[in-house]
Amino acid sequence: MSLRDKLFVTLQYLIPQHALSRLVGILARSEVPWIKTTFINMFMKRFGIDLSEAQIEDADQFPTFNAFFTRALKADARPLEASESNDIASPADGAVSQLGAIRANQVFQAKGHDYSLYDLLGGDSALASEFTNGQFATVYLSPRDYHRVHMPFTGTLRETRYVPGDLFSVNEATANGVPNLFARNERLVCIFDTEQGPMAVILVGAMIVAGIETVFSGQVTPLPKQVVTTDYLRSKPIALEKGEELGRFLLGSTVVMLFPEGKAKFAPNLKPGSQVRVRGKLGAYTNENKH
C-alpha cells in the first residue's frame, strides 16, 4: 500500500463513522432549496454525472439530494441482457471488485485478506453452510453510478438479516487495508430461494451511506446494534423477477452475491476491475457439479 492509502485507512479508524453518516443523511434528505441544489451541483461537477439516461433529466426537479442520488433510469436504459433462463444478471452498475470460488467458508477480499461466510452472514452457521465451496461476486458502486440494486435471478424472499457494524469507506485502499471489510461493515443480507437453490444478495453499507432501502420493507438501516432477522416465509410470499428492483443505497457502496456449490459459472471475460451494468450478463447457472 502507498503511504497515501495507509493514511486514508488510518483516518477511517479515527473518524466518527456513524455520526458523520447521520449528518450526511440529514443533509441528503433536506428539501431546503439552497442545500439540495448546492449538494447536487457539487456532486455532478465532481463526478461528471450524466442525467441523459435518467427519467428526470433536469437536476433542479429533484426534491432532495437523495432523490437525485437514487434516480430512476428510463425504461429502455438497461435492457435485460441476461435473457436466457439460466443467465445470472448483474445486480448493479459498477465494477467487479472480486469474484470466484468460495474456499470452504472463506471469501476472498484482496491479497492477504479473506473473510468468513459465518461472519458475513451475521453469525448463522446453518445459513453459511448453504454456500460452502460455492461462488461469490462482489460489485462496487462508485459515486457516479446508478444506485439501485436489481435481482440477479428470479427468486422468492426467504429472510433478511440486518447486521450492524462499522461504516468504513469501500474502495481499493480499504479492501487492501481493512481486514474483514465486508464482514464488519453494516449490511443487509437478503436470502432468496430460486429454482437453482439458495441465493444471497448482500447490500453492504459504507461511510456516509445514510441508509439502505428495499422494495419490500422501505428503509432498513440504521437499526439497533443487534442482528435482526425477518422471516418472510411466514407472510405472503415476496417473489421478484430477474432484473427487477430489489433495493437502493442512500449513498454509496457494494453488493456481494453468494451462490451454492457447483451452481454458478461467471463469464470468462470478467475479472477484478471489469465494468458491469445492471441487468447485463454476469454468468449463468450450470449443473455440471450438481450433487
From Swiss-Prot:
It is a peripheral membrane protein. One of its GO terms (biological process) is phosphatidylethanolamine biosynthetic process. InterPro entries: PS_Dcarbxylase (IPR003817), PSD-B (IPR033177), PSD_type1_pro (IPR033178). Transmembrane segments: none annotated. Pathway: Phospholipid metabolism; phosphatidylethanolamine biosynthesis; phosphatidylethanolamine from CDP-diacylglycerol: step 2/2. GO terms for cellular component: plasma membrane. Pfam families: PS_Dcarbxylase. The record marks G252, S253 as: Cleavage (non-hydrolytic). Binds 1 pyruvoyl group covalently per subunit. Its cofactor is pyruvate. It catalyses: a 1,2-diacyl-sn-glycero-3-phospho-L-serine + H(+) = a 1,2-diacyl-sn-glycero-3-phosphoethanolamine + CO2. Is synthesized initially as an inactive proenzyme. Formation of the active enzyme involves a self-maturation process in which the active site pyruvoyl group is generated from an internal serine residue via an autocatalytic post-translational modification. Two non-identical subunits are generated from the proenzyme in this reaction, and the pyruvate is formed at the N-terminus of the alpha chain, which is derived from the carboxyl end of the proenzyme. The active site is at D93 (charge relay system), H150 (charge relay system), S253 (charge relay system), S253 (schiff-base intermediate with substrate). GO terms for molecular function: phosphatidylserine decarboxylase activity. It is found in: Cell membrane. It is an enzyme of class 4 (lyase). NCBIfam families: PS_decarb. Heterodimer of a large membrane-associated beta subunit and a small pyruvoyl-containing alpha subunit. This is Phosphatidylserine decarboxylase proenzyme. It comes from Alcanivorax borkumensis (strain ATCC 700651 / DSM 11573 / NCIMB 13689 / SK2).
